[in-house]
């Protein structure tokens, strides 16, 4: 992007920020909590960009002053050397601010701020795949807890040998989807299973779907399309175990999507959870259809978000995790311990690079 174009866009953002501050001081808006919250949120989003824009303008002024000072001291070699050194430092600061503000101006995914439903399914590999699905669930639980998100299983189908055939986890917090969307796809593990007596390495898989939570307004579900059943669930213990039908078996007839929810204490709570999962699944279908054309045009994108795309291999023998989208290796143990920041940050950086290239092409 041309520097003049960047400055023009930053000025527009700065003017919007000033307008929001004026609105926040309006008594009429102050009496409307919902509108006040919306404006305050928008202002908060723009504030870091405006701060960096002002830093960029200040740096430009310092560069100009230093160049003028250089002209005045051409006969003073020592002074000239000091000024040139300062100019190099200022140009580095300017380039960093240009990079930072350009990234901040990139189009935002409106779903990035949402919480998600994380669905993990055992794939190829039988019982070992179920165990692997459980390992992935613990990995995401540790990652979420480290960040401060609320991580809670809402639906589970356990395997007889341990692990899960299928597990749905609710992950609530700030900007969850912006981080976890890069985890969607096939996760392959290569290791010697605990049940393997000959010491042979087995390959198993589990698929991860990352579904941003949807509002009822966005996904309308006609009650006539639902078939609701109940079942006994092992509740909180004591006399309630297996005696009260609190589990919900929900079938969406048009799509054939079935949700079985047992994790909550009451039938009403399980029904609400089941509806949340169903909405997220239907929203995922809507997004997939809406983005099909865009994805075909963006073959360089860091992952498609499709649950069938092989994204990562975890090799226990070599203590190595390979992310196939990045073509990079990471240490296995920290990854499984929930230290996903390095790999997720790398995915974000690559996606931002691709977006910047597209952005520059559109502008130029």
Swiss-Prot record:
Signal peptide: none annotated. Its main location: cytoplasm. GO terms for cellular component: cytoplasm. Methylated by PrmC. Methylation increases the termination efficiency of RF1. InterPro entries: PCRF, Pep_chain_release_fac_I, Pep_chain_release_fac_I_sf, Prokaryotic/Mito_RF, RF-1. GO terms for molecular function: translation release factor activity, codon specific. The modification N5-methylglutamine is found at residue 239. Keywords: Cytoplasm, Methylation, Protein biosynthesis. It is found in: Cytoplasm. Peptide chain release factor 1 directs the termination of translation in response to the peptide chain termination codons UAG and UAA. Belongs to the prokaryotic/mitochondrial release factor family. This is Peptide chain release factor 1. It comes from Prochlorococcus marinus (strain AS9601). The gene is prfA.
């Amino acid at each position: 992007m041309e520097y003049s174009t960047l400055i023009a866009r930053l000025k527009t953002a700065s003017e919007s920020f000033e307008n929001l501050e004026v609105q926040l001081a309006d008594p009429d808006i102050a009496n409307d909590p919902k509108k006040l919250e919306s404006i305050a949120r928008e202002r908060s989003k723009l504030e870091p960009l405006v701060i960096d824009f002002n830093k960029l303008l200040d740096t430009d002024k310092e560069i100009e002053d230093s160049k003028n000072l250089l002209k005045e001291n051409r006969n003073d070699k020592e002074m000239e050397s000091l000024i040139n050194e300062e100019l190099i430092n200022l140009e580095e600061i300017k380039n960093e601010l240009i990079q930072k503000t350009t990234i901040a101006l990139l189009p935002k995914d409106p779903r990035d701020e949402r919480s998600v439903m994380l669905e993990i399914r055992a794939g190829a590999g039988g019982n070992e795949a179920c165990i692997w699905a459980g390992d992935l669930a613990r990995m995401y639980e540790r990652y979420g807890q480290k960040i401060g998100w609320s991580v809670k299983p809402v639906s589970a189908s356990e395997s007889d040998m341990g692990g899960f055939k299928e597990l749905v986890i609710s992950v609530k917090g700030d900007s969850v989807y912006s981080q976890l969307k890069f985890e969607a796809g096939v996760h392959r593990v290569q290791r010697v299973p605990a049940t393997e007596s000959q010491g042979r390495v087995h390959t198993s898989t589990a698929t991860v779907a990352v579904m941003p939570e949807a509002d009822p307004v966005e996904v309308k579900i006609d009650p006539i399309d639902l078939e609701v059943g109940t079942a006994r669930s092992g509740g909180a213990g004591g006399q309630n175990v297996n005696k009260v039908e609190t589990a919900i078996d929900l079938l969406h007839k048009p799509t054939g999507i079935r949700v079985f929810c047992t994790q909550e204490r009451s039938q009403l709570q399980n029904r609400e959870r089941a509806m949340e999962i169903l909405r997220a699944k239907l929203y995922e279908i809507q997004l997939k259809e809406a983005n099909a054309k865009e994805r075909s045009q963006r073959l360089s994108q860091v992952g498609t978000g499709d649950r069938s795309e092989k994204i990562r291999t975890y090799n226990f023998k070599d203590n190595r995790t390979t992310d196939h989208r990045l073509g990079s290796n990471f240490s296995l143990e920290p990854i499984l311990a929930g230290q996903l920041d390095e790999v997720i940050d790398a995915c974000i950086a690559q996606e931002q690079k691709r977006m910047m290239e597209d952005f520059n092409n559109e502008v130029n």
